Every structure is written in structure tokens, then in C-alpha cells.
A protein has these predicted regions:
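Hydrophobic h-region of N-terminal signal peptides that target proteins for export
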Residues: 11-17
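PEST-like low-complexity, intrinsically disordered acidic/proline/serine-rich tracts
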Residues: 18-224
Length: 224
């Protein structure tokens, strides 16, 4: 087990299965305590454990580094194995709806015009990075992003919102480093859509996470 996975497992064990009370609707953000912020960022309607399927092979963009870490050669520094050879149980991730207002309030994030234009989802955990590597040239990066666009989507009721942009989210005092996926808000999600599903492929793994939209209400509004 890597240090990153151990940290995530430790957080999961400390957090209840689901908040007993929707404190985000009952308390002002300035009154949220550290435990409540952890809940909102790691186990809440806006932050869910991803379902990860390991199938071997490599269909999809893959960097040997984890988000926020320097590129490795062909070996995983913490386990001594390449990412594609790692045990399926080693892959852990949380998908966090980073553009949602309560998440931004918990992170004390600065206002950004991107949150008005995009649904932004953050994949945090012990999974391969899709960030650029130092030995890539511009053409290789562009080709890898095109591949990523083909395998990454946000779905609801049969409609697909395709990937617009991807970038690394740096580590801070509230969150591990992650990968940000940007999807256009041109196709608006509504509570009656019931569910939205994020999915992508990273080398040997499929990553999927389902969100229940009616649970993602904040002060009477669907916040995504």
C-alpha cells in the first residue's frame, strides 16, 4: 500500500459513512469545523469514492507519475512496480465536484470565471496522472489529450458532455494533489436528471463515479 493510499484509507476510516446532518445547509461556511470540511471534501454528495476496474493493457493516456509528483521512469517509487502492473486493490480515488459552491467554500477558493463556464471535477487519489511529463513535446501532449477526450465524459440520461480541458490540481493544506477535468456547462444538469456519471480510462484502469443530483442541493439550489 502506498503512502497516498494509506492516507486516503485513514481518512475514510475516520469519517462516518455519510454526514448525519446536512451541516452545509444548517450552518454558515465560516462556522464549519475541520471535521465537517473533511466530510464535505471527502465523503459527501459532492465527493464520492470512484469505482475502479482493472483490466490490464493500456487504452488511454497514462503518465507513470501520480498527480502533483515528478515524472518517474518506468517504476512506481512507492511500490517498486510499474503502474500497469500494480494490484487492482492499489488503485483508490475520490472524485470531487470542485466547481460546486460548497466545495469552493470549504476550500476557501478564490472566485474564478471557469466555475461559471465549466463543471470541474477533481480526481484525487492513488491513480496514474494524466498531467504532462517533462519529456513530452507539444505534439505528443496534444495527441494524448485527444485520446483523453475520447475516453473521458460526464453523462446524464444518455447525453454526454465531452472533456474540454485537463490540468493538475496542486496539493494544499486541505487536499492531496489531483487532476482537474473541465466539462462545458453548455448542457445544463438539472435535479430531474437524477444522476450524473463521470468516467475515464487511465492506462490499465477504468474509473467511474456516479453522483445523485437531488442530494447535491445547497441552500435550495443544485450546486455543481
Amino acid at each position: 500500500m502506498t503512502r497516498r493510499t494509506a492516507l486516503m484509507v485513514g481518512v475514510a476510516r475516520l469519517l462516518p459513512a455519510y454526514p448525519a446532518k446536512e451541516f452545509w445547509n444548517d450552518k454558515n461556511p465560516s462556522d464549519w469545523n475541520a471535521e465537517e470540511i473533511d466530510l464535505l471534501l471527502n465523503k459527501s454528495p459532492w465527493a464520492k469514492d470512484a469505482s475502479i476496474s482493472y483490466y490490464g493493457g493500456q487504452n488511454g493516456p497514462l503518465s507513470n507519475s501520480l498527480p502533483g509528483e515528478r515524472s518517474r521512469s518506468s517504476r512506481n517509487a512507492s511500490s517498486g512496480t510499474s503502474p500497469s502492473a500494480a494490484s487492482p486493490a492499489a488503485w483508490k480515488a475520490i472524485i470531487r465536484w470542485q466547481s460546486a459552491l460548497p466545495v469552493r467554500l470549504a476550500l476557501k477558493a478564490e472566485p474564478s470565471p471557469d466555475t461559471e463556464k465549466f463543471y470541474i471535477l477533481n480526481m484525487v487519489g492513488d491513480v496514474p496522472s494524466v498531467g504532462a511529463t517533462p519529456d513530452e513535446d507539444a505534439a505528443q501532449r496534444a495527441a494524448r489529450f485527444e485520446t483523453l477526450k475520447q475516453v473521458t465524459k460526464l453523462e446524464h440520461k444518455g447525453d454526454e458532455i465531452l472533456l474540454s480541458r485537463v490540468e493538475v490540481a496542486p496539493k494544499n493544506n486541505l487536499s492531496l494533489a489531483g487532476t482537474l477535468f473541465y466539462f462545458s456547462r453548455g448542457l445544463a444538469l438539472r435535479p430531474e436528471d437524477k444522476q450524473a456519471t463521470f468516467s475515464t480510462k487511465l492506462g490499465p484502469i477504468d474509473v467511474k463515479c456516479k453522483f445523485t443530483l437531488r442530494d447535491m442541493m445547497y441552500r435550495g439550489n443544485l450546486e455543481l
